[in-house]
Design a protein with these regions (language model features):
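Pre-Walker A adenine-sensing motif
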Residues: 7-19
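Acidic active-site catalytic centers that drive phospho-/nucleotidyl reactions
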Residues: 13, 60, 112
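Conserved P-loop
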Residues: 20-98
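A conditional alpha-helix N-cap/helix-loop micro-motif detector
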Residues: 5-9, 37, 89, 130-133
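P-loop NTPase motor core
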Residues: 86, 96-142
Length: 142
């Protein structure tokens, strides 16, 4: 049985048979305002609680509100959340590579959201964008 990371949201965890599968790349899709970022923050909080010796890498491309983060994190140790804000798909790829080398104990990686970077990069150079996206996806695999 594949271990799962619960979100601590009963309805979501029921749909996901207990939470997201660990050791896999999961895509959360939905319209704007449907709670994708809230779910990502909840999963981050639960990963920090479940694995206190690890860190969570959170890639923020949307300008996450610190107020929203503190509401969800409550008394959870937010110092275990490594927040990065890359400026492009290339920067995201390079930053992820560096962080993965520097922090061998990462319990969860969240990219919220990758759409804008992929779209912009793709418009500039389709071949390079596709290659970078595939490389980035491969480095996220355990």
């Amino acid at each position: 049985m594949i271990p799962r990371l619960p979100s601590n949201c009963e309805g979501v965890d029921k749909l996901l048979a207990g939470g997201i599968e660990q050791g896999t790349v999961s895509l959360v899709y939905g319209e704007a305002g449907t709670g994708k970022t809230s779910l990502a923050l909840q999963l981050s909080r639960e990963a920090i609680k479940a694995y206190p010796e690890h860190v969570v890498l959170f890639v923020d491309t949307e300008g996450l509100s610190l107020e929203r983060m503190s509401q969800i994190f409550g008394d959870c140790d937010a110092s275990k959340l490594l927040m990065i804000r890359p400026s492009s798909l290339t920067d995201l790829h390079q930053t992820l590579t560096r962080k993965l080398e520097k922090h061998p104990k990462i319990s969860l990686i969240v990219v919220d959201t990758i759409n804008a970077y992929v779209r912009l990069s793709y418009l500039k150079n389709k071949e390079l964008s596709s290659r970078q996206f595939l490389e980035m996806t491969s480095i996220l695999q355990p």
